[in-house]
């Protein structure tokens, strides 16, 4: 079943792309994840989900995670950062950005839309498929809702104009109304903490259960793209850590930064 965060138009575009691409090459599918500190927390979950997939030729998916804090489309060094990635000729790039750009995006939305389109074209013109990850809801105390909605709307509108681009709505980490929530229904159907706690207050960064939800959404998009094999999460996937959402990656030190962040 397709995730609720993927629009029907995107699913149709991905299905058409999958028909053109077939089942992948003998070298497997190469994916690079890019983004800021929230994406950094998402990276292990995305990698675990994707590496639990086998392609049609059984060669699997290789994921390189390259997210780090403080990066944005308008931040110094972004173009060089992107160039380094594209030089490796990935098949797929995932991109979650915008938090560090929000003030300038609010000041001049059309200029930011142009920048999003420029970066999008730069990626897909190399033959790479792009998955934009929308920014997830932020805690009300951060007073960033208006900024987040604007940035996500600009990115999703650009994504919708390009055939080889998918947009995944970050509200999949939210509650039934798409608003911030510390806990949510996890991949395995249980209620788990998906967002961090910092100094006793809600924080926008991710816990393993939140990272796994994003990983599942990306994996399902790429399955529709034409990566065939077992469905993500199936125990028969042959993932070395068993059920991918409970693997060793969930013990990564980033999920205990600050200490106790994901046990509150």
Feature-to-residue mapping (PLM):
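Bacterial N-terminal signal peptides that target proteins for export
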Residues: 1-10
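C-terminal motif of bacterial Sec signal peptides marking the signal peptidase cleavage site
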Residues: 17-20
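Bacterial signal peptide processing site
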Residues: 22-24
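Conserved SGNH/GDSL esterase-like catalytic core that processes O-acyl groups on lipids
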Residues: 28-114, 241-264
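Extracytoplasmic/secreted proteins, especially bacterial periplasmic and envelope-associated proteins
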Residues: 33, 41, 45, 80, ...
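Extracytoplasmic/secreted cell-surface and envelope-processing proteins
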Residues: 41-42, 101-109, 139-146, 176-179
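Active-site segments of SGNH/GDSL-like serine hydrolases
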Residues: 99-100, 121-152, 171-172
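Catalytic His-Asp segment of secreted/periplasmic serine-dependent ester chemistry enzymes
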Residues: 140-264
């Amino acid at each position: 079943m397709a995730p609720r965060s993927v629009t029907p138009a995107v699913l149709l575009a991905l299905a058409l792309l999958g028909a053109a691409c077939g089942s992948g090459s003998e070298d497997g599918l190469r994916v690079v994840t890019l983004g800021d500190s929230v994406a950094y927390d998402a990276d292990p979950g995305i990698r675990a989900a994707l590496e639990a997939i086998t392609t049609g030729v059984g060669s699997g998916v290789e994921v390189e995670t390259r997210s780090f804090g403080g990066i944005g489309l308008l931040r110094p060094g972004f173009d060089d950062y992107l160039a380094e990635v594209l030089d490796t000729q990935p098949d797929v790039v995932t991109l979650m950005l915008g938090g560090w750009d929000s003030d300038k995006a609010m000041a001049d939305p059309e200029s930011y839309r142009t920048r999003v389109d420029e970066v999008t074209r730069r990626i897909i013109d190399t033959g790479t498929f792009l998955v934009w990850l929308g920014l997830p809801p932020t805690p009300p105390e951060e007073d960033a809702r208006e900024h987040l909605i604007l940035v996500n709307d600009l990115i999703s509108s650009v994504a919708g104009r390009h055939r080889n681009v998918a947009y995944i709505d970050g509200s999949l980490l939210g509650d039934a109304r798409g608003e911030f929530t510390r806990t949510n229904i996890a991949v395995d159907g249980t209620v788990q903490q998906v967002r961090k706690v910092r100094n006793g207050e809600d924080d926008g960064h991710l816990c393993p259960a939140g990272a796994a939800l994003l990983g599942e959404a990306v994996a399902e998009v790429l399955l529709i793209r034409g990566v065939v094999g077992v469905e993500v999460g199936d125990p028969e996937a042959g993932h070395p850590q068993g059920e991918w959402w409970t693997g060793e990656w969930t013990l990564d030190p980033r999920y205990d930064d600050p200490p106790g962040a994901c046990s509150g």
